[in-house]
Structures are given as C-alpha cells and as structure tokens.
C-alpha cells in the first residue's frame, strides 16, 4: 500500500497544503522547527487517528483556529481509498470514501503505518508506559477489536479509580458498585491480555531472526511480557479471568486505601533479553538500538503477514541516530517494497541506493518545494 497525496488544513503550522508522493521513497528536508516532523506526523495521524507525539489533540490544530483537517488518498492492491480526519474541540470524526465512520476503531487499520522516530530508541530503556503504548498502537492496526476492548477498559478504569478515591473516606457503602466495576474491568482486561500474548508471540517470531541478522549471528533476542498478575501465555480466557478475580480480591483493601487500581493491563510491561541478559539493565546503547530496530523491522513483516500488504514506513529524523551499519541494514531491508518517508536536516552522509531515486520535499516554515531524483 502507498499514500499518493495528502491535504492539510489548519494542521500545526500548515494553513493549507496539497502534496503528492512517490510510491517508493520521499525525503523531507528542512531545518528544525520548520514543519517536516509535522508533515510526517500528519501522515501518521491520518492512519491512526492519534499522534505519536502528544495525547492532546488541541495541539494538532493551527493556532487560533477551531479545527484541523487531514485528507489523503491511499492506493491498496485492489482499491483506491480516500481517508479524512477532522479534528476539533468536540473530538475527531473520520471518513472512508466520504462515509463518516461511527467509531474510530472502524477507521483505524485501513492504512497501516510503522513510525520509527528518535523516541522509539527509548522503547527498551524508557518507561513501561512507552512499551504499553507501542503494544497498543501496533496491535490496534491489525486487530480493530483490540481497540474497542482497550477503549472500554479505559472507561471502566476511569470510573473505578474515581470510585476508589471516593471510598477512601467511607468504603462500606460503595463496595457493591466496586465489585461491578471490577467484573467489567476483568472482562475487558482479560481480552486485552489474550490479544497481547498472541501479538507478542508473532512479533517474537519475526524479531528474533531479524535481530540475529543485524548482530551477525552473535545475539539472540527474546521478548517477555510482564503482566501485573500471575498469568501466562498458555492460559485460556476463562483461566485469565479467574486469576484476575482472585488477584483483585486479594488487593481490594489496598486499592481502597490507595485510591487507585493496582492490577490490569495498564500496569503491565515488556522486557527484552539479548543472550539471556535484560537489555534495559545490562545492554549497551548499541544493543538497545539494535533491539529497537529489530522490533520496527519485525512490525513491518508482521503487518505484511496479517494484511498481505506492506505498511508505510515513517523514518522521522532517525537515520542520523543510527550508525552506518544499522542504517544500511534498515535501508537494504525496505528497498523496493515499502513506501518510505524520511525526514532529515540534510541528506549528506546518507549514501544509499534507496535514496537515489527519492522525491525530495523541502520544507521551510510550513511551505514546501518539491523535486524528484537526487542524482
């Protein structure tokens, strides 16, 4: 799949922009704070209906405007699809082929993207929240039902936490309601957990050989899910629910005392091991970066295996963060099969066949100038 064009209106620092793209490589060049990352982000938001940079949608709307709008056209193997996302203070509305979608989960997944930005290098050494977000965003693309369960879980979690804070003063009168929320949380949480186990099993199958290749056969990568309750990948849904119920019963008084939910997918984490050593704790910076690169390349192949088309790859100022060897491995892997967008302040020092035929887009203060063929 590839995106052929995009239109922006009141998006970040773009008042109005219409731009067409090559189906292979597009290089976006500009100094910092000129709008190249905003353009890359707009492609991501068009696909995912949320930003990888902020959770505050208001930041996506141009200063002093009431709304922002992104339109694009996606070419898939057997069809051409128009996508539109309107962002306002009231929320987001999405359209596919001019038809408004009732739920964003019906929209997300039509256009698949893999973003690789400098902050993704923190996937290994960053906070658990970074890794959970990685899971949610990537899994949501290939399993819309996961996004539904996640949104329902978040709603119940918010209600349950509000009730727990209220119960800190007087718990007895609200215990029945707490039990209702607990059962709802278990219902959605168990399904989220089951989907995460399945996804990580597939990701492991792709990431391990990729990591082995990048490390020239010297390193074996293992991805380990660390749930907040004592469950395992081998358990079925009913067993996971049973363990959740018993675990919530055991921490009930502690949750009331602390006024917050202590268990569930929102408390889980991922760990990465290279040659049986925890990369977050014992890995070198090079090993941490190789792990992040392996995961991103594995995402590309996993999405292809699920939807039978390669996703769009967004490389946002990340090539300069990789050494020549990892840079070459990345570009060799995607060459000729993945539509790729690259942002950079300069193409000097990046000598690779993949970039030779690229469309070059120069960005200066929210305006663009294009040229094709850097040769």
Curated annotation (Swiss-Prot):
Record has Cell wall biogenesis/degradation as a keyword: no
Keyword check for Oxidoreductase: no
UniProt KW keywords: ATP-binding, Cytoplasm, DNA damage, DNA repair, DNA replication, DNA-binding, Nucleotide-binding, SOS response
Chief localization: cytoplasm
Binding-site positions, ATP: 30-37
Pfam families linked: SMC_N
InterPro entries per record: DNA-binding_RecF, DNA-binding_RecF_CS, P-loop_NTPase, RecF/RecN/SMC_N, RecF_2
GO molecular-function term, one example from the UniProt record: ATP binding
First and last residue of the signal peptide: none
Residue pairs linked by disulfide bridges in the UniProt entry: none
Subcellular location(s) of the protein: Cytoplasm
Any one of the GO CC terms: cytoplasm
Gene Ontology BP terms: DNA replication; DNA synthesis involved in DNA repair; double-strand break repair; SOS response
Function as written in the Swiss-Prot or TrEMBL entry: The RecF protein is involved in DNA metabolism; it is required for DNA replication and normal SOS inducibility. RecF binds preferentially to single-stranded, linear DNA. It also seems to bind ATP.
Family indicated by similarity: Belongs to the RecF family.
Protein name (record): DNA replication and repair protein RecF
